[in-house]
């Protein structure tokens, strides 16, 4: 089997050296070239035809975003962004994902060599995922038109969504058309700390419903979406007659914190047939067991189809486990989940 050919673009010689060490330490990939800036990278891409590009977000001569935008228009290829953990870094990274980057890794703020080498397995996994990702499914999505929701007969109704690789854009596409009369949404997207707040703020500006990073103990309200904070689990809990959010630092589940399974299991327990579960694009199996629990509790469950997924991992696992009632294209997810909530449809198996 041929190795995954990687090209790294970073203005830091140290980062280029570290990325080369990491990539070449894995037998299924190789660093074919490195470039100090996008202008040099342009020629190296033509020469080496890499399978995956790792790209620093902030660089001299040509901004990483400008280069990414041109690259995706002229020669689309899988890109993993390398980002700082700053507020500006998270905003730029979210814009990069919007432009077509598959995923991102964050630079540690202190001890870059030790920190990056500690992330070696994670970086390799993201490169492998990017190499297999569907670029066709990652074309920039046009803003969907606003949907009409049926009357929300009960504040007990809610929607739980889980996603990973490719999920930031998929979630945007699902939330943007939702009207203010939508039920509450609880969302777990695999993301590091700091990025989830920027992600929520970005969505809040684009959507009619309110979108925010979830806080421990807050009441769950219709017309609002709550994003699990990075590196913390989010669960649905009850306080008397009302739903509320529980945020905690439990151990990683399926190697993830926040974990989709943690959210889905709590929704199965607290909301049962009043919930709709949605699993979107992502690598791995997080959410599959939780979605089965939701379906067994009477919830209607949806999975994004393979054709519209950047990575058809999590939906496939949920389908194979028997937890999915319906498989739909990303363009139909918003409409279908509102229809099921309004109709009060649920299924028991």
UniProtKB/Swiss-Prot annotation:
GO terms for biological process: chemotaxis. It is an enzyme of class 3 (hydrolase). Residues 152-344 form the CheB-type methylesterase domain. It is found in: Cytoplasm. The active site is at residues 164, 190, 286. Involved in chemotaxis. Part of a chemotaxis signal transduction system that modulates chemotaxis in response to various stimuli. Catalyzes the demethylation of specific methylglutamate residues introduced into the chemoreceptors (methyl-accepting chemotaxis proteins or MCP) by CheR. Also mediates the irreversible deamidation of specific glutamine residues to glutamic acid. This is Protein-glutamate methylesterase/protein-glutamine glutaminase. The lineage of its organism: Bacteria, Pseudomonadati, Pseudomonadota, Gammaproteobacteria, Enterobacterales. The gene is cheB.
């Amino acid at each position: 089997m041929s190795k995954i050919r990687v090209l790294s673009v970073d203005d830091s010689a140290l980062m280029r050296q570290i990325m080369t060490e990491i990539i070449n330490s894995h037998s299924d990939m190789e660093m074919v070239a490195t470039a100090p800036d996008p202008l040099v990278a342009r020629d190296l891409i033509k020469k080496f035809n890499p399978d995956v590009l790792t790209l620093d977000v902030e660089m001299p001569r040509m901004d990483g975003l400008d280069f990414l935008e041109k690259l995706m228009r002229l020669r689309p290829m899988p890109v993993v962004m390398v980002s700082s953990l700053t507020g500006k870094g998270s905003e730029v990274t979210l814009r990069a994902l919007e432009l077509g980057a598959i995923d991102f890794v964050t630079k540690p703020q202190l001890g870059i060599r030790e920190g990056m080498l500690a992330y070696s397995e994670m970086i390799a996994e993201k490169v492998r995922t990017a190499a297999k990702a569907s670029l066709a499914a990652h074309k920039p999505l046009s803003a969907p038109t606003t949907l009409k929701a049926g009357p929300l007969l009960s504040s007990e109704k809610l929607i739980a969504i889980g996603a990973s690789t490719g999920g930031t854009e998929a979630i945007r596409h699902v939330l943007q058309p939702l009207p203010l009369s939508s039920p509450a949404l609880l969302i777990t997207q695999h993301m590091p700390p700091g990025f989830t707040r920027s992600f929520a703020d970005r969505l809040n500006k684009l959507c009619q419903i309110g979108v925010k990073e979830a806080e421990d103990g807050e009441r769950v309200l219709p017309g609002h979406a709550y994003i699990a904070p990075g590196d913390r689990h989010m669960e649905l809990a009850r306080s008397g007659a009302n739903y509320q959010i529980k945020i905690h630092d439990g151990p990683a589940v399926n190697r993830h914190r926040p974990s989709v399974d943690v959210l889905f299991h709590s929704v199965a327990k607290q909301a049962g047939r009043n919930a709709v579960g949605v699993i979107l694009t992502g690598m791995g199996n997080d959410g599959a067991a939780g979605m089965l629990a939701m379906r067994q509790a009477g919830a209607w469950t949806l999975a994004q189809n393979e054709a519209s997924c950047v990575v058809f991992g999590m939906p496939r696992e949920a389908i194979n486990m028997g937890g999915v009632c319906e498989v739909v294209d990303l363009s139909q997810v918003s409409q279908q989940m509102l229809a099921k909530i309004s109709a009060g449809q649920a299924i028991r198996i």
